[in-house]
């Protein structure tokens, strides 16, 4: 169940309120076994009115301890390369497919994605971004509803209903592979070019 199941932007409440409501429903979630080993639920963070939403895989150790996505080494990398797209962390919204850390940072299991994905879909519906950047295979597979690998999907934009989707490498993987880091940076420059060519309506009139 991916982004294509979102029929339209139907939230009547302000986006900030809608996100608070989703987080309240999430509460002390025990819909899968990950609650047994987590320290914190990592809901998401950022600008509720962001044009660009980043979706990663799952919290890592630092994220689990601090309760915020992308705060470890991968987060530092993400913060740095956001500037290549003309963005700052406070401009975007960041979330993960899973809200709890899988033990040993293993890949999400299908039953975990099934349990957690309704919360992500509601976050997407509330924020209603123009662009979704999927970081790594699990997020890309969820959003684009495909099993094709990230190396074949990155480097271009994909239209999924209202949303423009840009798949790219997860910063954690790119930190282990200099060639992927270069491609990740290329993708962020491409994102910046796209944003310049497609300004937000309020920007276009300036």
Residue spans of the language-model regions?
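A polyanion-binding, active-site-adjacent surface
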Residues: 2-206
């Amino acid at each position: 169940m991916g982004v294509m199941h979102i029929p339209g932007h139907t939230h009547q409440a302000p986006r900030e309120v809608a996100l608070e409501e989703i987080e309240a429903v999430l509460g002390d979630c025990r819909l899968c076994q990950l609650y047994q080993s987590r320290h914190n639920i990592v809901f998401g963070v950022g600008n509720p009115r962001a044009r660009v939403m980043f979706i990663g895989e799952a919290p890592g150790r630092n994220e689990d301890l601090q309760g915020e996505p992308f705060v470890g080494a991968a987060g530092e990398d993400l913060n740095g390369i956001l500037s290549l797209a003309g963005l700052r962390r406070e401009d975007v919204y960041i979330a993960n497919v899973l809200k709890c850390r899988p033990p040993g940072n293993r890949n999400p299991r299908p039953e975990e994605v099934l349990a957690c994905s309704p919360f992500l879909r509601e976050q997407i519906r509330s924020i209603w971004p123009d662009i979704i950047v999927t970081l790594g295979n699990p997020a890309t597979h969820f959003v684009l509803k495909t099993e094709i690998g990230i190396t074949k999907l990155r480097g271009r934009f994909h239209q999924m209903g209202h949303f423009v989707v840009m798949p790219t490498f997860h910063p954690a993987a790119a930190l282990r592979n200099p060639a992927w880091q270069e491609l990740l940076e290329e993708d962020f420059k491409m994102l910046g070019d796209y944003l310049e060519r497609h300004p937000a309506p309020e920007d276009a009139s300036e």
